[in-house]
Regions:
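A short secondary-structure junction motif
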Residues: 15-19, 101, 185
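Alpha-helical transmembrane segments of integral membrane proteins
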Residues: 34-71, 100, 110-249
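Short, hydrophobic secondary-structure boundary micro-motifs
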Residues: 5-9, 21-24, 90-91, 106-108, ...
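Alpha-helical transmembrane segments and their lipid-water interface positions
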Residues: 17, 90-91, 140
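An internal, D/E-rich "acidic patch" concept
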Residues: 1-57
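Hydrophobic alpha-helical transmembrane segments of membrane transport/permease proteins
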Residues: 1-9, 102-118
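Membrane-water interface segments at the C-terminal ends of transmembrane alpha-helices
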Residues: 10-13, 77-107, 122-126, 133
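Active-site-proximal inter-transmembrane loops
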Residues: 72, 76
């Protein structure tokens, strides 16, 4: 019966002490319920982000080596299509094709390697498509710069030109975009975990909303925000380490 501002002040005070309240559904501290689900989401997101980043560097660099070539044109069409594909539509389509029709992969649940293929594949598609475009543009700019032309004029091997000079400088803009895509993967995990029945923080959040378990919902949102904020801080530090101009400023 206390006024709203008193209830809010009490909530903030409890929050500062790490008390998110108790889960109505599980009759346990909400923070414990959320912390149990975080490793599943982090493992899924980490694998997806690693594949997207490494794949984008490889495909984008190959496309930038010969701009407007056959590989470049194909990669642009495929990457633009991938970047535009909604996660929920791709997930449902993948289930219909690979689980229902072909019976190659399990429909839902968590287990061995086959259970990881579709969830990770869905999370990889959009970030991979966007990062390929960014890597391609950055590498084209880097490979046409004066220091690369000078290195080639001095007879430096092409492999060294691409990886030592081009790739190192061309990846700087990719770092910022990769941070945004890491946050996007965390958001996409909510959809993917719900569709494929993965017991991560995304599915936990949706289940808690449907069951009106508001303590778990609040804890899930705050923990997710902290993780995304931490990712952005790490990206800023990495950018400063790799780019001396930022450190000097």
């Amino acid at each position: 019966n206390d006024p709203i501002y008193i209830q809010f002040g009490r909530f903030v005070s409890d929050l500062a002490n790490g008390d998110f309240g108790d889960s109505l559904r599980k009759q346990r501290p909400a923070i414990d319920v959320v912390l149990e689900a975080i490793p599943v989401t982090l493992s899924l997101a980490a694998v997806a982000m690693s594949i997207a980043l490494l794949g984008a560097i490889l495909i984008g660099s190959l496309a930038a080596y010969k701009p407007n070539g056959v590989f470049d044109r194909i990669s642009r069409v495929v990457s633009l299509t991938a970047a535009s594909a909604p996660d929920f539509w791709v997930a449902i389509t993948a289930i219909l094709i690979f689980s229902v029709s072909l019976r190659w992969l399990p429909t839902s649940g968590i287990g061995g390697f086959p259970y990881w293929i579709m969830p990770i594949g869905i999370l990889v598609i959009r970030p991979l498509g966007l990062l390929v475009q960014v890597v391609r543009g950055s590498m084209i700019t880097a490979l046409s710069s004066d220091f690369v032309k000078t290195a080639r004029a001095k007879g430096v091997k092409e492999k060294s030109v691409i990886f030592k000079h081009g790739l190192r400088n061309g990846l700087l803009p990719v770092i910022t975009v990769a941070g945004d895509q890491a946050a996007a993967i965390a958001n996409g995990a909510v959809i993917v975990e719900t569709i494929f029945g993965w017991p991560g923080i995304g599915k936990l959040m949706i289940d808690s909303i449907l069951q009106r378990d508001f303590a778990v919902v609040q804890a899930s949102i705050l923990i997710t925000a902290i993780v995304i904020l931490s990712i952005n801080i790490i990206i800023d530090i990495a950018y400063a380490v790799l780019d001396p101009r930022i450190r000097h400023k």
